[in-house]
Amino acid sequence: MYSLIRKCLFSMDAETAHNFSIQALKLAGKLPINVLPMPLNPVEVMGLQFKNPIGLAAGADKNGEAIDGFGKLGFGFIEVGTVTPVAQDGNPKPRQFRILEAEGIINRNGFNNLGVDVLVENVKKAKYDGIIGINIGKNAVTPIERALDDYQICLRKVYEHADYITVNISSPNTKNLRTLQYGEALDDLLRSLKSEQESLSQKFNRYKPLVLKIAPDLTDEEIASVADGLIRHKIDGVIAGNTTLSRDPVVGLKNAEQQGGLSGKPLNTLSTRLISTLAEELNGTLPIIGSGGIHSVASGQEKIDAGASLLQVYSAMIYQGLALIQNLAKHIQVR
């Protein structure tokens, strides 16, 4: 069945196919039946109860338009965004490219979204009863020196409506964003956002975990530095990781020369290395959410065995269809 759907979707360019899928899932979300059952494989992470350890990665539903539709596919949690303080168009099109032979995707979207206020309204309307994370970023026009302002604006606006909040400082498609992963810039950001989290938890009388999303391109030394910052500032979790700038796994393939972040199956080895190195440095002090390149139960389990407590998928679903979510949710064994 999915082979027919995929043939139809792949006859369109990647972004048109994505937008079509979001509209279809919005419609599915309004139907009174589940498309697929919610597999029960419960796990507790960051003080939150997940019905199963498989989540939708950020970037799939940037504006929270199709939460209920995605929820009917069997995800134990859904992360929406990345969202910015005000709406922005992102980078010029075309900006999404399939690497068919490798089951990969390159994107240079640049945080295209309708703004945090629209996302919050969509989250408020959603009926999905799983865990919802909201992924926040900065506007392209905001100087990197003022990035904290954007993250604070978003954190304040989404806090009441999220189960957890992810701080995205690792997209390669927003100028200088990845510099926030290093040294004093990271220290200042984490310190300020942790303070904001504490204030908001008192205001709303509920603690919402704060998660950092990092790049798979960090060196071992840089991973150790990030881990140290996460521990010192008592950040609640880390997503390992975002898309990669490396083209080593897809060299010579059609579209491999396109600029942007590479996701999908080619990212698998790099993201598992990131999880493994991070797990060594963190030594169990905070949980890791594994993301990047998961395309089978074996590749997902590999990330759990490397140190992840939860998993996120997106690109592989485009190539393989909905059965992948069901298989992962049923068969992944969290240690």
From Swiss-Prot:
Question: Which Enzyme Commission number(s) are listed?
Answer: 1.3.5.2
- Name the residues that span the membrane: none
Name of a matching Pfam family? DHO_dh
Primary location recorded for the protein, binned into one broad class: membrane
InterPro entries reported for this sequence: Aldolase_TIM, DHO_dehydrogenase, Dihydroorotate_DH_1_2, Dihydroorotate_DH_2, Dihydroorotate_DH_cat, Dihydroorotate_DH_CS
Per the UniProt entry, the disulfide pairs are none
Q: What does the note accompanying the cofactor annotation read?
A: Binds 1 FMN per subunit.
Could you say which protein family the record assigns here? Answer: Belongs to the dihydroorotate dehydrogenase family. Type 2 subfamily.
Protein name as annotated? Dihydroorotate dehydrogenase (quinone)
Organism expressing this protein natively: Actinobacillus pleuropneumoniae serotype 7 (strain AP76)
| Organism classification | Bacteria, Pseudomonadati, Pseudomonadota, Gammaproteobacteria, Pasteurellales
